[in-house]
């Protein structure tokens, strides 16, 4: 039996796992923030793009005592993507070691060939009870106010643990209605994803024209950029907001950046993307 539970995505980490959890930094910090620091085994890729492969992961965590390994694919904020082959290698490796593999696919719809990489299907889950797939529906469909997310696994013991801590009214009427109708627009959504990927490629090229940014390639709906030269990440974020009413994310305080200057820039529509580029060119 496969069970999908609509829960806060970090609940799988917070309430259901008591041992050590492997986390790759930089990351979506709501996950490690739900655990005691002593229970986080942190891996920071030692390269300028914070990229990694399945081999890197196995090499680092191979001699570590883990109950679970968390993979965000594509990652947040780096946009790093593991291929289907690499994910399958980790799936088998974690099974052999008795490690629960938690994969967050919240941004996978934005990746090229993302549908082919996903492990969110019944046969895959049924064959791998140590696998948990998490997806934040609100991120990919652009409805953050609805607070929709799910965890899917064939491990009923784990699902039952999570369900005990879910509020009896964990989905409001707006979210429930959305879940009833969103399937009608699947073709529109798929087309929007294809259009988005094309726009992301265009935005990547235009951002590279900004002399104080080093843009890191991404398979998500954002770019992690290193701010170099005459600005700090804080200064750039502050100027864009105050002078141009444009908000980007200052990542300088995130773990793994070690005081470096990094920002995360969302990929939006052509007009908004061009407005941001023009604003930065005038700085």
Predicted ranges, named:
Residues 14-71:
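PLP-dependent aminotransferase-like
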Residues 130-216:
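PLP-dependent aminotransferase class I/II
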Residues 85, 242-243, 256-283:
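PLP-dependent enzyme catalytic core of the Aspartate aminotransferase-like
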């Amino acid at each position: 039996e496969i069970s999908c539970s609509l829960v806060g995505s970090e609940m799988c980490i917070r309430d259901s796992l008591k041992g050590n959890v492997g986390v790759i930094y930089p990351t979506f910090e709501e996950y490690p923030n739900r655990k005691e620091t002593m229970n986080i085994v942190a891996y920071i890729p030692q390269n300028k793009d914070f990229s990694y492969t399945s081999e890197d992961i196995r090499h680092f965590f191979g001699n570590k005592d883990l109950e679970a390994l968390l993979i965000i694919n594509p990652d947040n904020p780096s946009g790093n993507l593991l291929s289907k082959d690499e994910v399958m290698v980790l799936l088998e490796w974690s099974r052999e070691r008795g490690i629960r593999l938690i994969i967050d696919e919240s941004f996978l719809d934005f990746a090229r060939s993302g549908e082919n990489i996903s492990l969110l299907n019944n046969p895959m889950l049924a064959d791998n009870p140590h696998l948990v797939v998490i997806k934040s529906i609100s991120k990919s469909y652009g409805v953050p106010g609805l607070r929709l997310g799910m965890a899917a696994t064939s491990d009923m013991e784990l699902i039952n643990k999570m369900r005990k801590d879910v509020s009896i009214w964990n989905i409001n009427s707006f979210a429930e209605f959305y879940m009833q109708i969103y399937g009608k627009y699947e073709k529109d959504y798929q087309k929007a994803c294809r259009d988005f990927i094309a726009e992301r490629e265009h935005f990547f090229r235009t951002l590279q024209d900004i002399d104080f940014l080093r843009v890191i390639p991404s398979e998500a709906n954002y770019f992690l950029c290193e701010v170099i030269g005459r600005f700090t990440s804080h200064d750039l974020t502050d100027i864009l907001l105050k002078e141009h009413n444009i908000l980007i994310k200052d990542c300088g305080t995130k773990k793994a950046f070690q005081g470096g200057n990094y920002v995360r820039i969302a990929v939006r529509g052509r007009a908004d993307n061009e407005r941001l580029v023009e604003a930065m060119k005038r700085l």
